[in-house]
Amino acid sequence: EIEKITRRFAQELIKRDLISPSMNVPAPDIGTSSTEMAWIADEYRKINPVDINGAACVTGKPANKNGLVGREEATGRGVQFIVREFFRNPELLKLVKLDDDLSSKSFILQGFGNVGYHLSKFLTEDDKVKLIGLAEYNGGIYNEDGINVEHAKKYFIKNKSFENYPKASFVKDSSLLLKRQCDILIPAARENVITEKNAADISAKLIVEAANGPISYKGNQILNKNRIFVIPDILANSGGVAVSYFEWVKNIRH
């Protein structure tokens, strides 16, 4: 059903010239993956068989279907790079009253999809940052001693929930995890999760917007007043868009 809906939607977009290699090039987001992107590209080729740049009508395709190796994890990798650069900047660290030892820091993550999974994997394995809280739509887990990303991922895929997870405390209302004490809070799910209703309760010193628009305007005003530093989404999660551009260039240059 998903394939039928995706292909039909793509057909209607293409027939109306709403997507093409030179205009409105889609990429994966919540609920989609490289599979859906491949279906869209396939429909474009069927409707425009003589367009030699047809593969560039969409990015985030599988590597074996004119995609780019590394695109899947690019957004999470980009957030990791931004966090690293922040901790290399003495002036910014002074503002949030943190030292430059990233490996001694803790973080809480909201969202365990493509971006959240890869980001938490990179931060914990490469930079030794401790993941102490993990929030999903149907509950979260907390362990101040750290959470193993791969173990948590396997459990969530199998059970579709963190309930009864053996190596951390289950938190039914995962939004409460946003208020827990940590050095870095990373919302990587949906928009408007930090608003005027809960911004005053945020205790993290640094917030990194891995999701698009996770902080509302009024919520941001409260965070500014409380001197909580926010790395905005337009910078923090730009890794995916950057690598999508590389894929697009690869396609139009053949």
Pin down the residues of each PLM region.
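Glycine/serine-rich phosphate-binding loop and adjoining beta1-alpha1 elements at the start
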Residues: 1-103
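Conserved active-site and cofactor/substrate-binding residues in soluble primary-metabolism enzymes
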Residues: 4, 8, 31-35, 39, ...
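Rossmann-fold NAD(P) dinucleotide-binding segment
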Residues: 172-182, 190-207
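Short glycine-/small-residue-rich Rossmann-like dinucleotide-binding loops
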Residues: 186-190, 211-212
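Structural motif
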Residues: 108, 184-186, 208
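Glycine-rich phosphate/diphosphate-binding loop of Rossmann-like nucleotide-binding domains
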Residues: 62, 66-179
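Adenosine-phosphate binding glycine-rich loop
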Residues: 86, 201, 205-254
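Structural signal for hydrophobic packing residues in well-ordered secondary-structure cores
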Residues: 3-21, 41-52, 83-91, 114, ...
